[in-house]
């Protein structure tokens, strides 16, 4: 995974660091205001559709750049770049801390587009992290976290929320929202590195 992480860091070394100026754009009715039935599957967005991304107080559309197998590359107008694999955010660039790579240790159903069952799950991930300038001495490879995806709770407002609690090399909580009618993932809030806010994603509503 080191070679892939180094390639990612070099490829994106020209991305600027998001510095709090705000991501420009008028938001569609995102978040809890969007009825679940209007949202497309987050793990498999329709071709050409943008994601709506929220990072702290900043928000804006993230447009598809390219695809490599199951991975999708996205870029926001202010230069923040991230990669998704299924529902997982697996790499970032353009922030003070970069997630160079995230690899599953064992099975991770959230990296697939298939619906997730209601039972709790134990998951592990290996993370590669670096500073924004990608200097080798700042890189940390093979940082392992152990996670528990909590069992499914009763739906509220047509949504099922699943909470993933992780500890180990880093301690954080991820949240995933599924449409109750078909258990399709439509929204997520994910940790993407130390000292940066979580990244919240959903597929942008057409015409928004």
Where are these regions (language model features)?
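C-terminal motif of bacterial Sec signal peptides marking the signal peptidase cleavage site
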Residues: 11-14
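Acidic, serine/threonine-rich low-complexity disordered tracts
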Residues: 16-107, 112-208
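Bacterial N-terminal signal peptides that target proteins for export
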Residues: 1-7
């Amino acid at each position: 995974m080191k070679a892939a992480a180094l390639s990612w860091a070099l490829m994106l070394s020209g991305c600027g660091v998001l510095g709090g100026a705000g991501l420009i754009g008028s938001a569609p009715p995102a978040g809890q205001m969007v009825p679940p039935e209007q949202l497309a599957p987050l793990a498999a967005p329709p071709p050409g559709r943008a994601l709506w991304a929220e990072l702290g107080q900043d928000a804006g559309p993230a447009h598809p750049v390219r695809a490599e197998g199951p991975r999708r590359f996205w870029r926001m107008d202010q230069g923040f770049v991230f990669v998704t694999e299924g529902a997982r955010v697996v790499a970032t660039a353009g922030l003070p801390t970069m997630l160079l790579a995230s690899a599953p240790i064992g099975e991770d159903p959230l990296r697939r587009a298939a619906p997730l069952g209601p039972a709790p799950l134990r998951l592990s991930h290996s993370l590669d992290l670096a500073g924004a300038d990608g200097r080798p001495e700042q890189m940390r490879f093979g940082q392992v976290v152990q996670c528990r995806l909590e069992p499914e709770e009763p739906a509220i407002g047509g949504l099922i929320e699943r909470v993933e609690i992780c500890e180990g090399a880093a301690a954080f909580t991820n949240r995933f929202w599924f449409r109750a009618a078909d258990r399709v993932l439509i929204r997520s809030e994910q940790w993407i590195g130390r000292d940066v806010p979580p990244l919240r994603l959903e597929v942008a509503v057409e015409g928004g």
